[in-house]
Amino acid sequence: MTRQVRAFLTVVALILVGAVSSILTRYYDQLPNDTRPLPALAAGLPASNATARQDFALRIRARFPVGSDERALMLELWAEGFDRPGQNDGRHWASLERHDLVCSKAWTVTWTADDSGHLTAVEGTYIPSCS
């Protein structure tokens, strides 16, 4: 193999590596991320969407009953991988989302608390969506 052919093949290989890296970087966020295990609050829900919604709501109300500490709720949600809590007009929320190639799933916890940091209301919402 001549020096020119080796040089040409090296350039082609570098271009291919660059192209593949660019494509992977561009579409990384669209790759499935469901390979991570679900946190305890979201794991093990029934296959039926209606039942799963009810079970998640019950699970959240049982784990964080009205009157419990808001800070404990926020710390546990953060430790379980839920996003930073949002707030609007005294109502707080934190969500966890998972996606695969066709479906997405979202678990959201919403709550209100009094001035002393105790929960006055708490709800859990599970929303599966497949296109």
How would you name each of these model-derived features?
Residues M1-V5:
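Short, Lys/Arg-rich N-terminal segment immediately upstream of the first membrane anchor
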Residues R6-R26:
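Hydrophobic membrane-insertion alpha-helices, especially the h-region
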Residues V20-L58:
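Compositionally biased P/S/T/G-rich terminal and signal peptide-adjacent segments
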Residues A43-L75, E80:
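Terminal, regulation- and interaction-focused segments at domain boundaries
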Residues E70, D83, G117-T120:
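Short helix C-cap/helix-to-loop transition motifs enriched in small/turn-promoting residues
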Residues M74-T110:
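A cross-family detector of function-defining hotspots
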Residues L101-S131:
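Amphipathic N-proximal alpha-helical interface segments
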